[in-house]
Amino acid sequence: MQTITLLALLACIAVPIFADFDHLRARRDVVEASGEGSGESSGEKIVESSGEGSGESSGDKIVEASGEGSGEGSGASDAVLESSGEGSGENLSNGIVASDAPKDVKALTASEFAVSV
């Protein structure tokens, strides 16, 4: 009887020590870099960079870069890429690219739209 009690007590102590408590840990999904640096991330994270740097990410992400930097996003999933200032924005996956740089945009009239559809 004492052996069973000691084994139960030992199990109550040993199980929490060897158990995996990753779901209880606080995770930092936002990596922020400012100044002349860069922020890099992989997986489902958000990378924000400002100043003369760049933000790079792969996977499910949002990349924002401002100032004299660039933002590049590549991965197998959809991405949102925003760039402003003297930087450039490139996206190698199925996503949306928004930039403050002037671009040649042609507005379609109703008849042109009907013809293109």
Curated annotation (Swiss-Prot):
Residues 31-97 are annotated as: Disordered. Residues 1-19 form the signal peptide. Keywords: Glycoprotein, Proteoglycan, Signal. The keyword Protein transport does not apply. This is Chondroitin proteoglycan 7. Glycans are attached at S66, S70, S74, S84, S88, N91. It comes from the Eukaryota. The gene is cpg-7. Residues 32-41, 48-57, 75-95 have a biased composition (Low complexity). Coiled coil: none annotated.
